Amino acid sequence: FWPFGKKQEAKFMHRYGYYEIRCRFPKNDGWWSAFWLQSPCIGAHPDPRRAGVECDIMENYRMYKHKKLICGNIWGGYGAEACGHGHFNWPFVETPDGWHHYGVHWHPNGYVFYADGQEVGRVSPDPNDARKVLDGEGSNAGFAGAVVTGPVSEVEQFILVSTECAGYRETGRHAPTLEDAILPDFFEVDFVRVFDEIP
């Protein structure tokens, strides 16, 4: 569970549309920055369409050592009833000024994820749409360009922009990579924008 402090009512709830962030990452290894959508009732109903899904638009915890970013969805809650996820990873390429755009188009027929204007993956509720792309190591886990099968949330969700110390949630583990970090270090956000879905 995430120690976000006292839970407060979401200031902005929304369903469907295009969600985008412009951000610049911390320089030190050990940070886990993310831009994501969450349902206030995830896992509370057996049908994830009604309970919502965790939609990870961008996570950078694999950026420093593996030079990759990830995106994708998790549904069914976080305990024994957790049902699955469909995540994608793609190579991280730095820009000249360090600023990046990440987004997702969430619509009734699925999710389309973007990194710096390029599509990096899709989630579709239709198993016939599934298409896996092998990475250079033969893994068939979600890779840029793949389409995975998963539920589509039909409920309003809220936006989270977060940074945490990678690994701190694991029992008995701290984040040693940050012990020698050069501070200050920042996850900078220029904007978060939401564009409505127009029928």
Regions of interest found by a model, annotated:
Residues 1-199:
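GH16 jelly-roll
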